[in-house]
Amino acid sequence: RLVGSEMCIRDRLQMRHNNVSKVHIQKFIAEVESGAYPAPDVFVFSMGTNDRNLGSAEEALKGKTLDEVDVNTMAGGARWSIQTILEHYPQCRVFVCTPIQTGNPEHNALNLQKIAILRELCRALSVQLIDCYSNCGITEKFEQPSGSGRYLRDGLHPDKPGQELMGRYIAKEIRNHFF
């Protein structure tokens, strides 16, 4: 458990992590507006894996604008990110990928909480949720908490075969739900 200054450092890192996402999206939009890239037809988010300060979907979904959204929570950052892309690119299909199972059952319990929040946000914003946790083929039963398993190199991050497995699943889901 983290206490005192360690917790403060973790919270600041979480805040920085969410703000990095915001900066990347703002940079992407600026590059599209400058003509460096075409407007996207599809935008895929992979959300929740590194988040600790979850917030709630209920709080993140308050109001119609993004003015009051707390981007320092996973829920608020996700809403801000998704809605910003939808506002700038109304013809774009947005997909949100959930975290995958890890080799650590406790981490997976936290991932399930994140997925419940992401599912509620996706429903409210009418975007497709891609359930990598339940359907990509990576299961905690074949992974190690902090070592190499079937598809995870360290209990958390997919190795090359794991990346390929996830990629095929995500591509199939996009193909099956793109209209």
Q: PLM ranges: what are they?
A:
Residues 31-34, 80-88, 173:
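A generic secondary-structure signal
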Residues 49-50, 81-115:
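Active-site segments of SGNH/GDSL-like serine hydrolases
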Residues 5-76, 110:
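Conserved SGNH/GDSL esterase-like catalytic core that processes O-acyl groups on lipids
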